[in-house]
Each structure stands twice: as C-alpha cells, then as structure tokens.
Regions:
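Active-site metal-binding core of divalent-cation-utilizing nuclease and nuclease-like domains
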Residues: 26-53
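Short, C-terminally biased terminal segments at protein or domain edges
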Residues: 106-123
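Conserved catalytic cores of phosphodiester-cleaving nucleases, focusing on short active-site segments
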Residues: 43-66, 79
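Positively charged, solvent-exposed patches that mediate nucleic-acid binding
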Residues: 48-49, 93-94, 122
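Catalytic cores of nucleic-acid endonucleases
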Residues: 2, 60-108
C-alpha cells in the first residue's frame, strides 16, 4: 500500500471512530476512552452507560456485512485482554459488566450498533 493510500485509510478510520462516538453519545453512552492502547493492542472506543462497559470495535466498509466479516477471532482475544486492563483500573469494577460491540459505518447509511457482537468466552 502506498503512502497516500495508507493516509487515506487512516483518515477514514479516524472519521468512522468519531462518527461512532457521536452515535454512542446520542444513545446515552459516556465515552470513557478512545484508542485505548495496551501492550495487547488498541480498543477503538470504550463507552459506559450505567453499569455496562461497552468495548467497541469500529469498522468502516462499503456494506454492513463487510464490516461484520472484518472482525476476526485474534482481534477478539486482543479486545478481551485490553478490556480487562481497563476494567482493573475502575474503582467500581465489581459492579460493572463488559460487553463487546461492533459499530459498522457504511457510506450514506446511519451507523449500525450491534450490541454483544462477540463473546470472549467463545474463543
């Protein structure tokens, strides 16, 4: 991939993550972290609503189906490891419940938020 194409892809990802964050806020979530980095990898968005911590992967693709297919099992393990690091830092962690979501961004469509898209115990 050439440098210009990489930059375009990066910027598309940034735009998709911002749009996803706004969508979550409109649904009543508080954005706790964006691009949360650990030694295991990065989580696009960590959002909270009540006692639910949503670990959100954002995928921008031409169709919702392509976005759903873009999440792979090794990524899911990365999310779980990074999510546990975030959770360990929360003072009320015993009351919190983790959920792993996907927000699919497609051109000319509203974002699609799929709650509980994957479950780490299925790895």
């Amino acid at each position: 991939m050439n440098k210009k194409r990489k930059q375009k892809t990066y910027l598309r990802g940034i735009y998709a993550e911002r749009l996803a964050g706004l969508w979550l806020q409109m649904k009543g979530y508080h954005i706790a972290a964006r691009r949360f980095e650990t030694r295991f990898g990065e989580i696009d968005i960590i959002a909270r609503r009540g006692h639910v911590i949503a670990i959100v992967e954002v995928k921008a693709r031409l169709t919702i189906e392509e976005a759903m297919e873009a999440v792979k099992q090794p990524s899911e393990k990365r999310f779980d490891n990074a999510a546990n690091i975030f959770l360990a830092r929360q003072p009320d962690r015993k009351k919190l419940r983790l959920r792993y979501d996907l927000i699919a961004i497609s051109p000319w469509k509203l974002p699609r938020h799929i709650e509980g898209f994957f479950h780490p115990e299925n790895f």
